[in-house]
């Protein structure tokens, strides 16, 4: 068994496996920006693009594409996630996917080494039957992807943050708050908005949203009906919202953040690290994170047409544990060109009818099994896992056949083939059987892994 590791961010542990040979692509860091790129075998005009090698990380790619070339490439928000690995190969949602789609949708060309040691240059013109599987079929599954070429996009003019919280003073007012927010949701289910709304057992909603190509004044006008409703119920809610807007060109510019919003980032001060390396402070909690429970689900757009019913579902689920609703990790409401590109990938088609994605997780940091003083409390872990299971069972029961994002899913998902890939799975399995019949590449809940015993 051969396992591929890029940066090792996989939530399902697909970048490692027992009794296997591990290939680590960390030092393959070449990045090349193209003004006009024509995929191999193509006879059409070129498009702006970037080629990234297997060990490239998104911060390095954004530096080349945005800071130095004035373009945007659809990638991940966490700066240390790999740009040529499981993120793209597993579809790849980011904060701006309602505008730009998934990372896989931007793939123009892939260089892949198959199990029989054959080097293939895959595009929509050459080996087109590999095009879909590499665009969303999962990392470390069909071969070793040594480099990818991704379409780049015109840079948005502005980037904004919409951050705050609303606390309801009773269960009744919290249920009504959820309903009112879901009533309002269509106003932000579009290509301008992304990121999260968090619901908690403490009757609190946290808003951590981003927006693009809107001014602060436009955002204020969009949300004013919701603010007016809150103001009409001063005895029921305490709330505070901050709106900020910055030039999009500075999204990945460490000097801009250090000068203007230093509390939002963490500069990498370790000796010998590349200049300009940083991560978002909100990602601190992911360092050495030990998961007790991790479950997720797409929420069909049709459910948003009945806000009262969906509010009851969300309220009941929030009694067990907090969860986040991601605006940008679903494609109903996304820009048409982004949707058109993603329909050519092998992502579960149910995503096109989903208006949001929900994640419920319970975890701790600084937990290390086998190290005295840092061992997990098993009883505590099981109690939190049970809370996550109980809360997500309510959401799953309300969303049969909704499907899920394969990169961020329950490790124990029982019907993973259908949940992750829907009716695309037979095609994926056929490609797997053709290029890797002996299952040289096999990871947890990857295409064909059910045949590995």
Residue ranges and their predicted role:
Residues 1-453:
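Soluble FAD-dependent oxygen oxidases
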């Amino acid at each position: 068994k051969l396992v591929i590791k890029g940066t090792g961010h996989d939530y399902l542990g697909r970048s490692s496996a027992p009794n296997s040979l591990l290939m680590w692509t960390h030092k393959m860091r070449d990045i090349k920006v193209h003004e006009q790129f024509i995929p191999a075998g193509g006879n059409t005009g070129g498009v702006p693009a970037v080629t990234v090698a297997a060990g490239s990380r998104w911060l390095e790619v954004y530096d080349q594409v945005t800071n130095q070339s004035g373009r945007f490439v659809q990638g991940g928000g966490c700066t240390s996630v790999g740009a040529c690995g499981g993120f793209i190969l597993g579809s790849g949602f980011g904060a701006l996917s309602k505008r730009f789609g998934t990372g896989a949708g931007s793939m123009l060309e892939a260089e892949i080494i198959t199990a029989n040691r054959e080097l293939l240059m895959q595009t929509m013109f050459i080996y087109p039957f590999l095009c879909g599987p590499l665009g969303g079929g999962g990392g470390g599954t069909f071969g070793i992807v040594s480099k990818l070429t991704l379409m780049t996009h015109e840079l948005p003019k502005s980037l904004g943050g919409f951050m705050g919280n609303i606390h309801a003073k009773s269960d009744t007012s919290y249920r009504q708050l959820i309903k009112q927010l879901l009533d309002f949701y269509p106003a932000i289910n579009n290509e301008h908005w992304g990121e999260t709304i968090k619901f908690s057992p403490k009757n609190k909603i946290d808003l951590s949203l981003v927006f693009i190509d809107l001014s602060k004044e436009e955002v204020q006008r969009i949300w004013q009906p919701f603010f007016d409703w809150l103001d009409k119920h001063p005895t029921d809610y305490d709330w505070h919202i901050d709106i900020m807007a910055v030039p999009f060109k500075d999204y990945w510019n460490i000097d801009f953040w250090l000068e203007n919003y230093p509390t939002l980032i963490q500069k990498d001060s370790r000796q010998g690290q590349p200049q300009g390396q940083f991560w978002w402070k909100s990602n601190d909690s992911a360092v050495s994170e030990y998961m007790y429970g991790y479950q997720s689900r797409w929420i069909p757009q049709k459910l948003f047409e009945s806000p009262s019913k969906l509010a009851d579902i969300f309220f009941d689920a929030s009694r067990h544990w907090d969860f986040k609703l991601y605006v940008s990790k679903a494609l109903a409401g996304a820009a048409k060109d982004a949707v058109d590109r993603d329909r050519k990938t092998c992502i579960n088609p149910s995503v096109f009818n989903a208006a949001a994605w929900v994640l419920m997780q319970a975890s701790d940091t600084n937990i290390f099994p086998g190290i005295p003083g840092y061992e997990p409390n098993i009883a505590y872990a099981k109690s939190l896992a049970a809370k996550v299971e109980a809360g997500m069972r309510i959401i799953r029961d309300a969303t049969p056949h909704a499907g899920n994002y394969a990169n961020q899913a329950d490790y124990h998902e029982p019907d993973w083939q259908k949940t992750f890939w829907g009716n695309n799975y037979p095609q994926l399995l056929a490609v797997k059987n053709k290029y890797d019949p002996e299952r040289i590449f096999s990871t947890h809940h990857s295409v064909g892994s059910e045949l590995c015993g």
